[in-house]
Amino acid sequence: MTKVLVMFMDFLFENSWKAVCPYNPKLDLKDIYIYDTTLRDGEQTPGVCFTKEQKLEIARKLDELGLKQIEAGFPIVSEREADIVKTIANEGLNADILALCRALKKDIDKAIECDVDGIITFIATSPLHLKYKFNNKSLDEILEMGVEAVEYAKEHGLFVAFSAEDATRTPIEDLIKVHKAAEEAGADRVHIADTTGCATPQSMEFICKTLKENLKKAHIGVHCHNDFGFAVINSIYGLIGGAKAVSTTVNGIGERAGNAALEELIMALTVLYDVDLGLNLEVLPELCRMVEEYSGIKMPKNKPIVGELVFAHESGIHVDAVIENPLTYEPFLPEKIGLKRNILLGKHSGCRAVAYKLKLMGIDYDREMLCEIVKKVKEIREEGKFITDEVFKEIVEEVLRKRNKN
């Protein structure tokens, strides 16, 4: 590393809210946007069923975040679902409200009744689905259904996204044929759905790049599942390949292994790739906790971005550095998304962490007292007891009592 680069990085670390690898590419991604499907695909997680009020609250919070589009549901599923979608559509949100529809007029009619701004109409295109899901229908037959659905929805003034289900297992020449036909029928956006999460970042980039070269004006959207933990990076590589829109769910909930996590995608683009999405980032933690509560799906404590332990530090070596400059062991400052860091005490704690806690408590100490408390903290944690603030207070009081007796 050159001396100039070292000086530049020192300047950045001292004057920035983030510190990332200087070799990260700066992506020229203009006019990209997110369409969130927590209320539809997220609710398809086995065991999840949001109430009407819960869906409304989540929609409001997504809108507060600043998302361009919210996929509110699948109206044809039930009258209750249709009522919820219609209520969200008439809530007066800034975001456009979309509904999911099969490539069937009755589905689209139901969506129209719900007053939505647009639809995502889908039909499978892979040989696997054509054989086993559609009883050996030909691609041309499927294509005809898709085109009719797009034309019908456009006749009714809707924004239309056409989604090729199982796109990543569809031959590229078939994808081009299907999506060109959808565009010619009036589709505003076409989707690459990685339905089983089987694509790699490189294949997502290739598919999106190839498709973009063959389309005239329709935006490309990517809808990635997380079966191999690739949903977020596949989404990013889709953008690199020319996609403009990304499908997400809060906390990555969804069928099987879930979808691209909204909060992870946003912060990866913002922090690592220096992309300004124009969003209210401080909304993210509250939104994630809300979906955690309403879905009943607990987030791991080490969940990227918003997990309980993401900005927590215990190791003495780490704590010493973090107190001097948090970016030594954090890629970005938690305050950027409305969170705070937490200095924890345990087996690996050193004098600096304990001194930090004592200072917060307003307690004076000398070196001997500090070392005694550190020793006690390690002993109690190794006995299996967590050093909560209350436990630490008890340790301090015990040490003070002993010192006063002497």
UniProtKB/Swiss-Prot annotation:
Residues 32-285 form the Pyruvate carboxyltransferase domain. Pathway: Organic acid metabolism; 2-oxosuberate biosynthesis. Coiled coil: none annotated. One of its GO terms (molecular function) is homocitrate synthase activity. It catalyses: acetyl-CoA + 2-oxoglutarate + H2O = (2R)-homocitrate + CoA + H(+); 2-oxoadipate + acetyl-CoA + H2O = (R)-dihomocitrate + CoA + H(+); 2-oxoheptanedioate + acetyl-CoA + H2O = (R)-trihomocitrate + CoA + H(+). Its EC number is 2.3.3.14, 2.3.3.-. The keyword Transferase applies. InterPro entries: AIPM/Hcit_synth_CS, Aldolase_TIM, LEU1_arch, LeuA/HCS_post-cat, PYR_CT. It comes from the Archaea. GO terms for biological process: coenzyme B biosynthetic process. CDD domains: DRE_TIM_IPMS. Keywords: Transferase. The keyword Transferase applies. PANTHER family: (R)-CITRAMALATE SYNTHASE CIMA, HOMOCITRATE SYNTHASE. Has been shown to catalyze the formation of trans-homoaconitate. However, probably physiologically functions as an (R)-homocitrate/(R)-dihomocitrate/(R)-trihomocitrate synthase. Belongs to the alpha-IPM synthase/homocitrate synthase family. Catalyzes the condensation of alpha-ketoglutarate and acetyl-CoA to form (R)-homocitrate. Can also catalyze the condensation of alpha-ketoadipate with acetyl-CoA to form (R)-homo(2)citrate, and the condensation of alpha-ketopimelate with acetyl-CoA to form (R)-homo(3)citrate. These reactions are part of the biosynthesis pathway of coenzyme B and biotin. This is Homocitrate synthase AksA.
